[in-house]
Amino acid sequence: EGELLCGARFINSTHPTMISEIFHNYFAETIILPTDVPCCEISRLFLDKERRDSSSLQGVPASKALFLAMNIYCIKNKYHGMYAVVSRGMYAIFRHANWKVEVIQRGLSEKGEVIYYIFMPASINIIEDIISKDKSSHWLREMLEHLRHL
């Protein structure tokens, strides 16, 4: 009946992560997740654009709805935010969504492409920043209400 449109994998920072096991090799300086504050790694982040467009969601900010869900997940789990290693394109999507992500370090992937080790804070203020400047803010607020009840 339903089809998966987007998703992300969350791993508590106290467990082995892609950052600690794999991605650390792509950075000049050691990158580690803090284990003294509640946070997580986010990986396997995706949005199926074909599925979005074929399900009459074209023009709807589905990526921002995913970002709201990520924030709600963190807030409910008392995480201060998420750490990730992302491509230049993904970093640009976060910035375009008005999410004030912090670049901790730049690195190079195995393909020689620039990647970023980033921190994405999670809070009600971040959610407001993501929603406030979007022309579909009413739709995003509706999605937010659904997400709060999950």
PLM segments and residue spans:
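Short loop segments at secondary-structure junctions
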Residues: 1-2, 50, 121-126
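Conserved beta-strand in the GNAT
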Residues: 3-12
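Acyl-donor binding region in acyl/amide transferases
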Residues: 13-101, 105-107, 111-115
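Accessory, usually C-terminal, subdomains that scaffold auxiliary metal cofactors
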Residues: 105-150
